[in-house]
Amino acid sequence: MKKLFVLLTALFTLTQVNAQEKNVIRIATDNTDLILQVAPNGRLYQAYLGDKLLNEKDINNFSPYVKGGSDGSVSTRGWEVYPGSGAEDYFEPAVAITHNDGNPSTILRYVSSEQKAVAGGTETVIQLKDDQYPVEVTLHYIAYPKENVIKTWSEIKHAEKKPVTIWRYASTMLYFSGNEYYLTEFSSDWAKEAQMSTQPLLFGKKVIDTKLGSRAAMHTHPFFELGFEQPAQETQGRAMLGTIGWTGNFQFTFEVDNVGNLRVIPAINPYASDYELKPNEVFTTPEFIFTFSNNGTGEASRNLHAWARNYQLKDGQGDRMTLLNNWENTYFKFDEKLLAELMKEAKHLGVDMFLLDDGWFGNKHPRNSDNAGLGDWEVMKSKLPGGIPALVKSAKEAGVKFGIWIEPEMINPKSELFEKHPDWAITLPNRETYYYRNQLVLDLSNPKVQDFVFGVVDNILTANPEVAFFKWDCNSPITNIYSPYLKNKQGQLYIDHVRGIYNVLERIKDKYPNVPMMLCSGGGARCDYEALKYFTEFWCSDNTDPIERLFIQWGFSQIFPAKAMDAHVTSWNKKTSVKFRTDVASMCKLGFDLGLKELNADEQTFCQNAVANWTRLKKVILDGDQYRLVSPYDGNHMSVMYAAPDKNKAVLYTYDIHPRFGEKLLPVKLQGLDAKKMYKVKEINL
């Protein structure tokens, strides 16, 4: 046995040496291998991306020259990992730079690589360099073995004498070879988020992008699914899920070339964003996160859910608070007495927190509608004379925590802030101003504006340290696209604006690491894994009609765990029962926008019991493995379940969306359980 062990060790060591000699870089999870190889020309190519290789020796059996074109030219290149522009490649580049001498070409050659342990996995860092210009690109890959997730991003820098212009800056580039590819995308609009549709990818380019800036994902979301040889299915077939962590303009390019190979290019959208990069300044691209499964999208989603809870989502291992929000109770019309009554209702309902929404601020220009007040973050004395301290006190007396709504990135022209600092708003200097929802976007590329936005949160928490939660809204895309701060560098606005937001959020996280925040953007128009480093959850949609929410939550659950998704019981579609509305909301992080006075005694008792049941089972719902059993896209029924990782407990939701006379009801096969165990089944929320 000892001899055999020595022999196996020797073979493994030899394999590692051979791999190094061939300049092979292996990026591996427990189920996936990404093999990169340096060719004799010094350039780095993708040699393999697929199932985990069972034999270590196989990593030496690949060639960087993998798929040639009909004229043979492509065969001299292969699938370059980070191809530049202006040379011999005929397709979309990963990076494009105009150098000081006007040359628009970039060719990167391999310099070095290293691997190091990081939380949950292994990071591979690869250095590339242009041999004609002092340009360097650093590729980063973090492989999370257990979750079968890979996260990748790139860094671009140069040492030319003057700034260069970069006009393509992909996070990465991935290649696939197959007979058929199918793309599932997630379109959106206000109250109609995460709508799934599937199409084949044929010759040419399919581009999904957004140009909206701040409310970036209002029309399309920053994630997708790929099905290989067939449309992506829930429980069978090979599927890939991908998402980019960028709270701004993003772009996915899917390009099928002349011999049927597919390139996937996730990136910041280069639209109106020729970026001036100073010498030795580092341009960091967004993270692209992806996972594979041979057992359909359900398993791939569970990969992402586990990864997010473990490593990406703010307080991913922590608890979540149920809440009562006043918005649909009061809109802008409230006072201290009414809010105190709602806090008592929150306690009676059994939730953890009362959340005060829009309409609490502004004095010279009071926020009694959406026409005024944004930017003036002082409590409205005429409405709330006791200020936030009085509200915190009332919440404490009622026995609930207190949270508050803010929209700190926005400004109304009717505000003291705009009167003092009109140059802080993104607006054109010589054209008629267009207002979206009567407001403008503050210019977060400006450090002074960043300080102001940070101060909105900091001032509230400094004066009121018992404020327990923020709902951070963003209701407008960027309009009137001009930054008074950037002046002649307008190509940097869309990018530096987002980076300014991250700077603010990083400062908040550093000073107040334990304060949970909800990400909201007129519904679900902000939903990415970079923002969720700073937010514990996001608001999926203003549409809380339970029928529509089944589709919306089904779509978002492809990428995000229930712990990150907020769902509230409201008065939308009052024709549906309170039970239906509550059951649908309890599939995610539960909240209420429904006043108890709207409910009869039986409905109030039902809601109290439902909150108690959700609280009792939230560990399974928020941290369990999700199994999507019956899709609402397939008919009149829908079913989802959550199973505890130890398989000792599960929660099952089933819905007959549009009951029909004499309809055929089919049994639902449960998943995530142990067939050898006996389970007690109990229906709840009756």
Language-model-detected regions and their locations in the chain:
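Bacterial Sec-dependent N-terminal signal peptides
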Residues: 1-22
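Polysaccharide-binding surfaces and accessory modules of carbohydrate-active proteins
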Residues: 21-35, 44-255, 271, 678-685
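Carbohydrate-binding surface patches
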Residues: 31, 224-226, 234, 631-674
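Conserved, mostly hydrophobic/aromatic
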Residues: 31, 154, 280, 324, ...
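Short Pro-Gly-centered flexible turn/kink motifs
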Residues: 103-110, 275-294
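Aromatic-lined carbohydrate-binding/catalytic grooves of carbohydrate-active enzymes
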Residues: 315-455, 464, 469
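Active-site neighborhood of glycoside hydrolase catalytic domains
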Residues: 380-387, 393, 397, 419-579, ...
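Aromatic- and carboxylate-lined catalytic core of secreted/periplasmic carbohydrate-active enzymes
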Residues: 585-589, 593-630
